[in-house]
Amino acid sequence: MFVQLLTYGLVAASTLQGVFASTKLPILDLPYGRWRAAKYDEAADDGSYGPPCIPGPDAPGFEDPSYKRQQKAAREDCLFLDAYVPGNALRNRGHRKLPVIVWVYGGGYSLGSKDLAIEEGIYDGNSLVQRAAGNAIVITFNYRLSALGWLAGTTMENEGLPNAGLHDQRAVFEWVRDYVHLLGGDRDKVSAWGESAGGGSILSHITANQGIVDPLFKRAVVMSPGLDFPIDRKGSVENQFKAFASRAGCAGQGLACLRAANISQLIEASYKDLGQIGPTPDGRVLKHVFSVDIAQGNYWRHLDSLIISHVYDEGGPFVGNDSTLESLSGFLKSNFPTYATEAVSTLEDYYHLKAPSNESVRAIGSRLIRDAIFTCNIRDILRKYSKKSYLMQYSPKEATHGQDVFALWYSPKLWNVSIPLFSGYQSYFLSHAITGDPNTLRDRDISPPTIAWPKVGDINAEKLENTLDVVDTGYKLISDNQVLKSTCDLWQKLLLDVTKQGGYLDI
């Protein structure tokens, strides 16, 4: 057992093969009630992982036993952090400081935790530290979810804290800035890694505060970044808050009633069609939806290097077997403000939703959701960071959303199986975290062999060149036909038009 003194208390850690794992660091506390900013907690670590945050309902197509366990174990007091530190970092703290990886998990802003599937090695930092040969520190953490983490709207703006989950994440990056040197880490070499909601969160930190506040990381890995487009914060977003309050028995009574409500009331209310959940414009931290902020120049300009990736099939798992052209039109109408009829009609034409076509409904829906929620976010961040970015498509067995997480967190000793493709894949990411370049430390003595990975090609091209395609047989460079310029230009234009139409560009 190792005990480390931080400035606010003692932290205990267990050790596994030279990696000290300090779990359930009580980094943040919620002393003043719900939907407020958290603060550092002074309690000491007790060696357990700590409870996860209260989730929303399972996402269609992603039901999993681990989510059921999360629902049973979850508590409001959930803001804990796990630090995986190689022994050499603690023994040699006066010498070389190590790069730090901070993982932001996905789950649609409604599900997930830092140790959701820890038994299978998912989000277990021991393996990554060992694969990095002790040359990196890994941090994982919880953040508030569902209604408790992402309610927004004008009532929240006036009485509470919109995007509380995003503030929780920011507090962790501040903790890393303030304390990671005591664990042998280098606060100037922090990499933010995230998938799905985690990737969307990282993009939101890049545009937060109109891009004038340091997000506290220099490198980023953004995998399948998921973001909705809740533009109308005074209209549909506020109506979402009112509907939630009504279901919780607090209609017309403001946030004070919700803060006093029994947690079971809030959980039940969040399970009944909560609607869009995730980073939402609040007029303060997030000025606009991500694509609009990028177009307006509201982004942090001083990142050193990024890896951006998507899987072969992002949208497919979100399209039900009973989907119709009408239900896909309903997806657009429910995500855009009610006044955005022209934008919706334009997209209905673009995706052939008004009349049957030769393309199957499932294929249309998959493409629509892919573009709207995932890949056009990739095109948008690359508009500003193409000269510092590496682009990847993860394609083994025509991979669907989330499957690349298993490759990133691959643990050969825990899984009792060797998957060389996953080992090579990991080496790109760890090389990037340690050096800023995925090529420097990539595994060259492995089969299938890794290959040189150049930065992404001309951002003005319809298809992005130099995309590293990860397939069952290895790696190759392709032109990416899923992040199309014409498609994403259309989406960005329409989001700008709708934002302006609602009167939000001048707010």
Swiss-Prot record:
Sorted alphabetically, the Gene Ontology cellular component annotations on this record are: extracellular region
For this entry, the protein name equals Secreted lipase ARB_01498
Q: Which UniProt keywords apply?
A: Glycoprotein, Hydrolase, Lipid degradation, Lipid metabolism, Secreted, Signal
> What's the catalysed reaction?
a triacylglycerol + H2O = a diacylglycerol + a fatty acid + H(+)
Question: What top-level branch of life does the organism fall under?
Answer: Eukaryota
Q: Which Pfam families match?
A: COesterase
Q: Which family does it belong to?
A: Belongs to the type-B carboxylesterase/lipase family.
Glycan attachment positions = 262, 321, 358, 416
- Give any GO molecular function from the UniProt entry: triacylglycerol lipase activity
The catalytic activity of this protein is classed by the Enzyme Commission as 3.1.1.3
PANTHER family reported for this sequence: CARBOXYLIC ESTER HYDROLASE (PTHR45570:SF1)
The record's subcellular locations are:
Secreted
Q: Give the organism, scientific name.
A: Arthroderma benhamiae (strain ATCC MYA-4681 / CBS 112371) (Trichophyton mentagrophytes)
Per the UniProt entry, the signal peptide is 1-21
The entry's active site is 196 (acyl-ester intermediate)
Q: Provide one Gene Ontology biological process annotation.
A: lipid catabolic process
